[in-house]
């Protein structure tokens, strides 16, 4: 007979004495893509499982359990992020043992409420990395993907079809520029906006977008970030994994090589504002 054990942990808001729950910590708007706090954490765990090949090894029909992780797992905040622990049998066989996932604050910081950011002990490096990820999302709206859009509300201008932008807190083109300025310098903001020609435009006082996503560079894998600070300025270094196509496996394979990119920034009102953004994807 296999012995059974269970892990339980609780976190408290020391300013109120109440339990810390994800619902209490989440912002109403979610992150820039509209992902809730729970969704942001879920996607990181999902990616960890995929990267390690665990879904092929011994996990079976686990996705619904992951999506409901606040109910089915034990959550514990640490100095590095959130530890999510599933006991035996929940998402894997007993022999696999408890499944423990560490999710860095930088992966879900942008979906936290402002109050949550004041009570969680998040390092400056993690907040800078979170700002970098937000800036990368904004970059992608101009050079790789589409921003959140309401496809049920459309308009046609000069033969081009536009969808209503569904970016939280952004109603107009000027509002989009203001959002950019939270994360990049005015020069970069104007460069990004200028690269789109008429893709983003105000129609009847609302921001509309022409769909034009191209997808990413498939020869680049995941990346890691480190931030070096010197007072109110610093440099974030992004180290990207290089991939090559494997004809036999019909898949992209790790070459064992990496490339590094540097992003200088200045801290403004607690946010990292980047003055260069050589994002390679």
Residue ranges and their predicted role:
Residues 199-247:
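Surface-exposed, charged secondary-structure patches
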Residues 1-6, 91-95, 241-257:
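Short, cysteine-centered beta-strand-loop-beta hairpins and adjacent loop/turn segments enriched
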Residues 8-11, 222-227, 259-267:
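Hydrophobic/aromatic beta-strand elements that line small-molecule binding cavities or substrate pockets
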Residues 120-210:
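Core segments of small alpha/beta cavity-forming domains
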Residues 14-21, 235-237, 256-281:
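Short beta-strand edge/turn micro-motifs at domain boundaries
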Residues 1-4, 168-173, 182, 232-242:
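Exposed beta-strand-loop-beta-strand "reactive/processing" segments of non-cytosolic proteins
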């Amino acid at each position: 007979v296999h012995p059974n054990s269970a892990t339980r942990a609780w976190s408290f808001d020391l300013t109120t004495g109440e339990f810390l729950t994800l619902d209490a910590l989440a912002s109403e708007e979610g992150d820039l893509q509209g992902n809730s706090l729970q969704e942001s954490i879920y996607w990181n765990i999902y990616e960890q499982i995929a990267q390690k090949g665990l879904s092929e090894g011994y996990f079976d029909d686990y996705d619904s359990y992951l999506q409901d992780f606040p109910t089915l797992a034990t959550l514990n905040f640490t100095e590095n992020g959130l530890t999510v622990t599933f006991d035996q049998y929940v998402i894997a066989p007993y022999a696999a043992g408890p499944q423990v996932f560490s999710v860095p604050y930088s992966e879900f910081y942008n979906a936290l409420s402002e109050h949550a950011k004041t009570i969680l002990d998040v390092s400056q490096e993690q907040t800078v990395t979170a700002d970098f990820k937000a800036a990368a999302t904004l970059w992608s709206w101009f050079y790789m993907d589409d921003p959140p859009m309401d496809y049920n509300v459309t308009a046609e201008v000069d033969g081009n079809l536009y969808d209503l932008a569904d970016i939280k807190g952004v109603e107009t083109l000027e509002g989009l520029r203001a959002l950019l300025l939270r994360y990049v310098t005015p020069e970069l903001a104007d460069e990004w906006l200028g690269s789109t020609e008429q893709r983003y435009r105000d129609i009847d006082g609302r921001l509309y977008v022409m769909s034009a996503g191209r997808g990413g560079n498939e020869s680049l894998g995941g990346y890691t970030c480190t931030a070096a600070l010197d007072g109110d300025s610093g440099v974030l270094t992004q180290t990207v994994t290089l991939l090559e196509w494997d004809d036999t496996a019909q898949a992209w394979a790790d070459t064992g090589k990496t490339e590094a990119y540097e992003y200088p920034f200045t801290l403004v009102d607690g946010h990292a504002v980047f003055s260069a953004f050589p994002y390679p994807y």
